[in-house]
């Protein structure tokens, strides 16, 4: 296979504290293939040359996750700047200019620490209903906002812990209209929220090792009527039927060293029949992307990336895989063709690369958080 294309990285780089300097990194990268292989060469061979640079643009405090609306060509970002939730919002961003068009005024709630914002962490787009779903992780709730008005239309905030619809520590959410559910990761369970009734059904996975607390990973994937769930504690990928909620299969993730793998995100390339799984590992060991046969789940290869590989997405048209490294703040680029190798690492803004998404035109939008640096901001009280 030969590849001739031009790619663009667009990164939203931002501070992790309430008054930290924020920015957006636009990273143009070109991947140019060699001419068609000679007759003596394999038709699957390709050589990719890459060039990359970063351009920084203003972002949001504490960005955690990013989502994309194909219908409106808008980028959505959820962010909470500090653990005390003094700053939290969701933003709608023009995908072409990366300019912030609007931000939501999140509700202020009362808890044992006083009055704080309803903290936004995970986010996904529902273009069928014209909404965005947000996980309020540290507040143990889910909220839905109108894409146009940014007004909250539904939330689980305020329900009792004894309520069967209560979800503990919701982290990632994904809407699937084929099954009529919104799937939410959290502590102990994956929850399926009925899109019409908003009733919750808990999906039980295999128990965590040694009876410990299970931490479902940040991202999940729905593909072909199956829900793919990375489970960080036990290092497994669970494959769940989206209609019956039955676990059809599971497989262990692999790294390049002894110890925990801690899978975090997952993508499938049907043209290569491969599953890609990012893993954070521990202290730099097992950080990278592992590759599996999409049919048999047989382990094929591990590609080391950075020191804490986190989010992952793939460009199936060009067989490219992108992975954010929270440890180094870089975005790794993997040739997902026959070579299955790391071909580039693109630096962002010196922060911690958190999440990313591939757009239909092949651009990549990545968000990061600054590493705790603060700034003095002049202001006047009215």
What are these regions (language model features)?
Residues 1-33:
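Gram-negative bacterial Sec-dependent N-terminal signal peptides
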